[in-house]
Swiss-Prot record:
Modified residues (Phosphothreonine): 231
Quaternary state and interactors: Monomer. Homodimer. Homotetramer. Interacts with RHO (via the phosphorylated C-terminus).
Tissue expression notes: Retina and pineal gland.
Keywords in alphabetical order: Cell projection, Membrane, Phosphoprotein
One term of GO molecular function: phosphoprotein binding
Main subcellular location: other
Subcellular location field: Cell projection, Cilium, Photoreceptor outer segment; Membrane
Phosphoprotein among keywords: yes
Family recorded in the similarity comment: Belongs to the arrestin family.
Entry protein name: S-arrestin
Annotated organism of origin: Rattus norvegicus
Amino acid sequence: MAACVKTNKSHVIFKKVSRDKSVTIYLGKRDYIDHVSQVEPVDGVVLVDPELVKGKKVYVTLTCAFRYGQEDIDVIGLTFRRDLYFSRVQVYPPVGAMSAPTQLQLSLLKKLGDNTYPFLLTFPDYLPCSVMLQPAPQDVGKSCGVDFEVKAFATDITDAEEDKIPKKSSVRLLIRKVQHAPPEMGPQPCAEASWQFFMSDKPLHLSVSLSKEIYFHGEPIPVTVTVTNNTEKVVKKIKVSVEQIANVVLYSSDYYVKPVASEETQEKVQPNSTLTKTLVLVPLLANNRERRGIALDGKIKHEDTNLASSTIIKEGIDRTVMGILVSYHIKVKLTVSGFLGELTSSEVATEVPFRLMHPQPEDPAKESVQDENLVFEEFARQNLKDTGENTEGKKDEDAGQDE
């Protein structure tokens, strides 16, 4: 009988090399989780070629920026960008006392050998998560949204400015700061509303309920609707939709309300009768790709993402620095016959809030990083669950293009 051999799970390491091969950066992941109380730090290593660096210093920076995007151009024709956060650490030559390397860094230091230097970058708790507003297909340039960039570069200029850093000796990577569903859900969402119509003694009553407060991306959302029609009118149609509300709070407090999924029934509710119906909605980016202004979780280059997750704000944090706040609700709209019966109609509606998020990932403490299980991959985004599509990330030993 064959022996049972336990295999350890491979750990993908994302790498990127500068054009002149002087610096190579390695990260263990691309998404960093905001747990509201604290945010995962960015830990990685930089491999330096001493012959090519030739006495220069090597730095790693973390930048959070809000881009106003194609639609918001100032009077001199420049796309506006506002840096919300910037930090920099020198990794070569090492300076000061180094913190204890993480398990990932220890494995990379052992795997890559000499001339490898660890770094650790932290997020303050007031920064927004990665989010962007989807441009129209014909739009060009940067999209409106919040992004995070890690950059490694070699320079001999003290306090080097962005435009003075030699591009051939630098490499930049877009990463994401993301939130996941909290471990405990809130109360089951529900709403009730009544409307009194002219020449009807009794009201039209609508009750809407969801099975839970948080749904995961790609998960069906069953919406139970009960219409109690005590009027003399006919409810001709019931339409249920998921609406996304994106509030751009940083500069103008604009609201973008976009339906991202809808279902309807033509089943009529006659006077003095009751109907209970459950309609199922699945909000997906795949069904909203051509629509401008839909909020998405931050994306990198041409790789896929998903509809933006609901925003959770830490208590006491100023909302105006959060970039774009995203929320969702279910909207139920009834079409009711008017004075002339089938020839005219009126509409009434009510809303039920809920949250759309990613599930909590596996506990990283349960995962071990083994030297022999490191797989190096080009820094390119993977598809996420709600796109309805599935493509494989391309692997490459020396990914040199900027993202």
